[in-house]
C-alpha cells in the first residue's frame, strides 16, 4: 500500500513539473455599469442602477513533448466567485483536446452567437433564452477541435452525464447518469471567397429518463461575410425538447 502511494505521488509530481515548464500567466478584467428602466413609475423599476464585473486568469505554456496548453479560470458576480474554467491541450497537427467547465469552447456551443455584433450579443441584458443552443450544457465536457484543412474545421463535444456539475480533480458529480450528449460544429471558410464563413452545428441528448418520450435535439446554420469594416451575418437555430408537451424554439438572428 505504501509503495502504491509513493508511485502515485511521483507520477503527480512529474505531471505538475511538465505543466509548469515555460508557463505564462495573464490577468484580464472588465466591468459594466447600467441604468435600466422597466417603464411606468419609479415604484415599478426600483433601483435602476447595476454593476457587473469579471476577472479572467489564463495560463499558457509548452510541455516537454512540444505540445502547448492553456488553462483558464473566470470569476464573475459581485462576490467574484469562480464562474467557469477550462483546460486546452494543443497537440500540433493532431488538433486540440479540451476539458470544459462552463466556458463553452467545444462543439455546438462555439456557434451560439455567430452573427456579427458591435458590442455584445443580440440577447445581452434582456430577458429570454436567445437561440437556446447549449449542447445540454458545458459542464465537465470533453472536447476536440481539428486543425483547418482547406478552410474546413470540426469541433466535437461529449457530455457523459448531463446532470453533472463541476468537480475538482479526483471528484465526481451527478446523482447517477440520466442522459448523455454528443454535439459538433463544422465551419468552412472557402479560399475562393475571402471573408465568407459557413457554419453548421448539431446536438443530440440521449435521454434515459422514463418521464421523457424522446431525445433532445439542437441544430443551427450560419453564414457570415466580412469585407473591411463591413460585417454581415445570418443564423437560424432550432431546439426541440423530447419532453411530452414541451414547446420547441426556432430563432433567426441577423
Model-derived features with residue positions:
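Outer-membrane beta-barrel proteins
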Residues: 1-254
Amino acid at each position: 500500500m505504501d509503495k502504491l502511494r509513493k508511485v502515485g505521488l511521483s507520477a503527480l509530481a512529474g505531471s505538475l513539473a511538465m505543466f509548469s515548464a515555460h508557463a505564462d500567466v495573464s490577468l484580464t478584467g472588465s466591468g459594466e455599469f447600467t441604468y435600466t428602466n422597466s417603464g411606468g413609475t419609479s415604484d415599478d423599476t426600483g433601483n435602476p442602477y447595476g454593476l457587473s464585473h469579471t476577472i479572467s486568469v489564463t495560463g499558457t505554456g509548452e510541455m516537454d513533448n512540444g505540445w502547448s496548453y492553456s488553462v483558464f479560470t473566470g470569476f464573475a458576480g459581485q462576490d467574484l466567485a469562480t464562474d467557469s474554467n477550462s483546460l486546452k491541450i494543443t497537440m500540433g497537427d493532431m488538433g486540440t483536446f479540451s476539458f470544459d467547465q462552463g466556458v463553452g469552447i467545444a462543439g455546438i456551443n462555439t456557434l451560439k452567437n455567430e452573427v456579427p455584433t458591435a458590442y455584445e450579443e443580440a440577447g445581452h441584458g434582456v430577458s429570454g433564452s436567445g437561440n437556446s443552443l447549449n449542447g445540454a450544457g458545458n459542464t465537465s465536457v470533453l472536447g476536440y477541435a481539428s486543425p483547418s484543412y482547406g478552410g474546413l474545421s470540426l469541433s466535437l463535444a461529449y457530455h457523459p452525464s448531463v446532470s453533472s456539475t463541476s468537480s475538482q480533480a479526483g471528484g465526481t458529480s451527478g446523482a447517477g447518469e440520466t442522459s448523455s450528449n454528443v454535439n459538433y460544429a463544422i465551419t468552412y471558410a472557402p479560399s475562393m471567397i475571402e471573408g465568407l464563413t459557413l457554419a453548421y452545428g448539431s446536438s443530440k441528448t440521449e435521454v434515459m429518463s422514463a418521464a421523457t418520450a424522446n431525445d433532445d435535439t439542437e441544430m443551427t446554420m450560419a453564414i457570415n461575410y466580412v469585407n473591411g469594416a463591413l460585417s454581415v451575418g445570418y443564423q437560424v437555430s432550432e431546439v426541440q425538447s423530447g419532453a411530452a408537451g414541451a414547446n420547441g424554439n426556432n430563432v433567426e438572428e441577423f
